[in-house]
Amino acid sequence: MSNIKLIVGLANPGEKYAQTRHNAGAWYVQELARVCGATLVADSKYFGLTARVTLHGKDVRLLIPSTFMNLSGKSVGAMANFFRIEADEILVAHDELDMEPGVAKFKLGGGHGGHNGLKDIIASLANNKGFYRLRIGIGHPGDKSQVSNYVLGKAPGTEQAAIEDVIDEAVRSTEVLFNQDMAKAMNRLHAYKA
């Protein structure tokens, strides 16, 4: 049974960024909310879109920060502080350059790997890196100088379909996480390739 009380999907706000690779974490939270029959609503107190869902009897908050990516910690910190949620009770879904589209993995702890959203969340949690992550593969452009344009661009059709397929599997694996445990959820998700 999971101890997670807050699930966060990282994104940049606005229509301009809605369909960009950098928003893959938000796509996961949007799909999770849809499956749970919840509606994400703007809440200025938490600087984001929020919903409250029940996953296998557990009360869980969903959050998509409406700050820009590099200020995600403002939103996560506000909600974690208000509800007294510890770092190891948080799951942050984010785009991952070092994995191909169609692959996603759960992970506990670690650094930010250059991801500005994770960097700001770590800072907002008093440098506590001990939160769970859902890393959603978006692939790498091959050239480090192209990363910014790449993550802020839209994936071509086949890559987008693979990302959406693995997000669907990540939502199913999240249900396993809450119904059973992280090890079983990891085994299921890590074996999947869209």
Curated annotation (Swiss-Prot):
The keyword RNA-binding applies. Pfam families: Pept_tRNA_hydro (PF01195). Keywords: Cytoplasm, Hydrolase, RNA-binding, tRNA-binding. It catalyses: an N-acyl-L-alpha-aminoacyl-tRNA + H2O = an N-acyl-L-amino acid + a tRNA + H(+). TRNA binds at Y17, F68, N70, N116. GO terms for molecular function: peptidyl-tRNA hydrolase activity; tRNA binding. It comes from the Bacteria. The keyword Manganese does not apply. SUPFAM superfamilies: Peptidyl-tRNA hydrolase-like. GO terms for cellular component: cytoplasm. The record marks D95 as: Stabilizes the basic form of H active site to accept a proton. The record marks N12 as: Discriminates between blocked and unblocked aminoacyl-tRNA. Its EC number is 3.1.1.29. The active site is at H22 (proton acceptor). Hydrolyzes ribosome-free peptidyl-tRNAs (with 1 or more amino acids incorporated), which drop off the ribosome during protein synthesis, or as a result of ribosome stalling. Catalyzes the release of premature peptidyl moieties from peptidyl-tRNA molecules trapped in stalled 50S ribosomal subunits, and thus maintains levels of free tRNAs and 50S ribosomes. Belongs to the PTH family. Monomer. This is Peptidyl-tRNA hydrolase. It comes from Shewanella woodyi (strain ATCC 51908 / MS32).
